[in-house]
UniProtKB/Swiss-Prot annotation:
The keyword Aminoacyl-tRNA synthetase applies. Residues 557-657 form the tRNA-binding domain. This is Methionine--tRNA ligase. It comes from the Bacteria. It holds the Pfam family Anticodon_1. One of its GO terms (biological process) is methionyl-tRNA aminoacylation. It is found in: Cytoplasm. Belongs to the class-I aminoacyl-tRNA synthetase family. MetG type 2B subfamily. Coiled coil: none annotated. InterPro entries: aa-tRNA-synth_I_CS, Anticodon_Met, M/V/L/I-tRNA-synth_anticd-bd, Met-tRNA-synth_bsu_C, Met-tRNA_synth, Met-tRNA_synth_2, Methionyl/Leucyl_tRNA_Synth, MetRS_core. Homodimer. It comes from Staphylococcus aureus (strain Mu50 / ATCC 700699). GO terms for molecular function: ATP binding; methionine-tRNA ligase activity; tRNA binding. GO terms for cellular component: cytoplasm.
Length: 657
């Protein structure tokens, strides 16, 4: 009987620089899902790859004095090396410069052109080369004016300067698919996850009206050219999205993989590109009369304390450094445990070291070490066979083991990785407590308690086996080391199916003579300092920029500004704007409405309940038809806004001086 298939993809990464921990986050998450599904018995296909066309790549190659392919080959080698270091179990790696991909892009474009879904027109808009994205005037950050007209500004995504571009372009008529797309959303309510992303797509992009999409460029040459009009290069997002089916051999001489694995079960990506995957990609597939993927999951960003991590800002964490110094398992564990998948999370060196020391070294490592040491001490290394529960504590542990598997499975199916790991660690902690409750050192002094002591050891080893099996999707080394030290070498006992019934070790086994520490304990202070130093690479002369200062003011000028503490009690998107949020704040003596340009950096759910600083004596203004009675303070660096948060102990209405 053929196995049920499962097709999972990551975004294809843009190789304009070295990848950072944020890229590793997406790919490790995909790997965890792939390994978990394989353990469940699925025929899994896991795809990742690189998006290699566009103006930015062309400019990078020229600057390096290389051809585009020479530049790309070097970058892709580094990416593949990182994936190997992370032990990513992908089944394929697609490059958009490969012929198997370009062939599909050409055919798809010509088909859509022939059937009238693509038409020729002219496009004018504000374009950011690094982001490879067009923006409307209302989307620009720090717009520059001359005689009342916008003459420039910055990308809301990265803070890069934009330029006004006007050129002949092909357009994809996505607006005609609006009703069909909304109907698909209604029929498939779990298509976009988390649900907040779905609401964002509908309210911010679909309801205001989908504008037809420019899908070609003529201002550069590096990309897939339109066969019937070669001066046009297919726009990066149409080119890139097709990778999910070109990698399966769609429109090739052999479509067996496509027929077997499509539609995809999960497309994984970071939240900034969910719009392309949840709107443009489904519409493109509808136009091609192909089945749509089952789920699009947009995870949050890994943030630093100073905002979003990005290559262009230079505040990145290099996963190579973490792996080389602390090992792969510690790195993978931190990413999946500390950061709730689907929401933003903050990377801190302190949390990384704490997770390694407390969770891995103390809880798991010590449990394995203590258990093996006791089996050696009390039974000369020969673990007695499992006899069933002999005590109510045994019954409690067995019930908890089965319940842990159930809860873990529910969390894994909904991609709540941190919750799944938390469930496993509760079980590990309970097992450590079981040692203290059963007091093996006391039982060992009484020969009449030999059977009871042996059964305690059997339960400890079985619990450790349960934990090791459940950790296999996350940790690629520790479970193997645990099985080796326990001398569990039957592959069936390492599979997910072996957890359906407690107590499979019905024959005695000989554990290792001397337990080996799986996770060495770290010197917290030294390692926190090391990670912080690695995150602060010295700037080159080329990177250093003098930040202009504003004119000095005296205290009288500052005293004119009234700033008070307030709590955000409600927030929603402003219709027809993807930049503005309408926010209600509680100032103790009154409530006010403030319109703030932070929608690119926060969802309404992100900010409700936050204590913020509000300028309360600004003249009221109207933005997009909405009254704004003040300004919420935020910090800006490289185009990224971060709210200035206040301690919760500060009362609403308190004046900030």
């Amino acid at each position: 009987m053929a196995k049920e298939t499962f097709y999972i993809t990551t975004p294809i990464y843009y190789p304009s620089g070295n990848l950072h921990i944020g890229h590793a986050y997406s790919t490790v998450a995909g790997d965890v899902i792939a390994r978990y599904k394989r353990m469940q018995g699925y025929d899994v296909r896991y795809l990742t790859g690189t998006d290699e066309h566009g103006q930015k790549i062309q400019e990078k190659a020229q600057k390096a004095g290389k051809t585009e392919i020479e530049y790309l080959d070097e970058m892709i080698a580094g990416i593949k090396q990182l994936w190997a270091k992370l032990e990513i179990s992908n089944d394929d790696f697609i490059r958009t410069t490969e012929e198997r991909h370009k062939h599909v892009v050409e055919q798809v474009f010509e088909r859509l052109l022939k059937q009238g879904d693509i038409y020729l027109g002219e496009y004018e808009g504000w374009y950011s080369v690094p982001d490879e994205t067009y923006y409307t005037e209302s989307q620009l950050v720090d717009p520059q004016y001359e005689n009342g007209k916008i003459i420039g500004g910055k990308s809301p995504d990265s803070g890069h300067e934009v330029e006004l571009v006007k050129e002949e372009s092909y357009f994809f008529n996505i607006s005609k698919y609006t009703d069909r797309l909304l109907e698909f959303y209604d029929q498939n309510p779990d298509f976009i996850q988390p649900p907040s992303r779905k609401n964002e797509m509908i309210n911010n992009f679909i309801k205001p009206g989908l504008a037809d999409l420019a899908v070609s460029r003529t201002s550069f040459n590096w990309g897939v050219h339109v066969p019937s009009n070669p001066k046009h290069v297919v726009y990066v997002w149409i080119d890139a999205l097709v990778n999910y089916i070109s990698a399966l051999g769609y429109l090739s001489d052999d479509e067996s993989l496509f027929n077997k694995y499509w539609p995809a079960d999960i497309h994984l990506m970071a939240k900034e590109i969910v719009r392309f995957h949840s709107i443009i990609w489904p519409i493109l597939l509808m136009a091609l009369d192909l089945p749509l993927p089952k789920k699009v999951f947009a995870h949050g960003w890994i943030l630093m304390k100073d905002g979003k991590m990005s290559k262009s800002k230079g505040n990145v964490v290099d996963p190579n450094i973490l792996i080389d110094r602390y090992g792969l398992d510690a790195t993978r564990y931190y990413l999946m445990r500390e950061l709730p998948f689907g929401s933003d999370g903050v990377f801190t060196p302190e949390a990384f070291v704490e997770r390694t020391n407390f969770d891995l070294a103390n809880d798991l490592g010590n449990l394995v070490n203590r258990t093996i040491s006791m089996v050696n001490k009390y039974f000369d290394g020969e673990l007695p066979a499992y006899q069933g529960p002999l005590h109510e504590l045994d019954e409690e542990m067995e019930a908890m083991a089965l319940e842990t598997v159930k809860s873990y499975t529910e969390s894994m199916e909904s991609l709540q990785f941190s919750v799944a790991l938390s469930t496993v660690w509760k079980f590990i902690s309970r097992t450590n407590k079981y040692i203290d409750e059963t007091t093996p050192w006391v039982l060992a002094k009484d020969d009449s308690q030999k059977d009871m002591l042996g059964n305690v050891m059997a339960h400890l080893v079985e619990n450790i086996r349960y934990a090791a099996v459940l950790l296999r999707p996350f940790l690629t080394h520790a479970p193997k080391e645990i099985f080796e030290q326990l001398n569990i070498n039957n592959p069936q006992f390492m599979e997910f199916s072996s957890l359906e019934q407690y107590g499979v070790l019905t024959e005695s086994i000989m554990v290792t003579g001397q337990p080996k520490p799986i996770f060495p304990r770290l010197d917290s202070e030294a390692e926190i300092a090391y990670i912080k130093e690695s995150m602060q690479p010295p700037a080159t002369e080329e990177e250093k920029e003098e930040i202009p200062s504003k004119p000095q003011i005296d205290i009288k000028d500052f005293d004119k500004v009234e700033i008070k503490a307030a709590t955000i009690i409600d927030a929603e998107h402003v219709k027809k704007s993807d930049k503005l949020l309408k926010i209600q704040v509680d100032l103790d003596s009154e409530q006010r409405q403030i319109v703030s340009g932070i929608a690119k950096f926060y969802t309404p759910d992100d900010i409700i309940g936050k204590k913020v600083a509000v300028v309360t004596n600004l003249k009221p203004a109207k933005l997009m038809g909405q009254k704004s009675e003040g300004m919420i303070l935020s910090a800006e660096k490289d185009g990224v806004l971060t709210l200035v948060s206040l301690p919760s102990a500060i009362p609403n209405g308190a004046v900030i001086k």
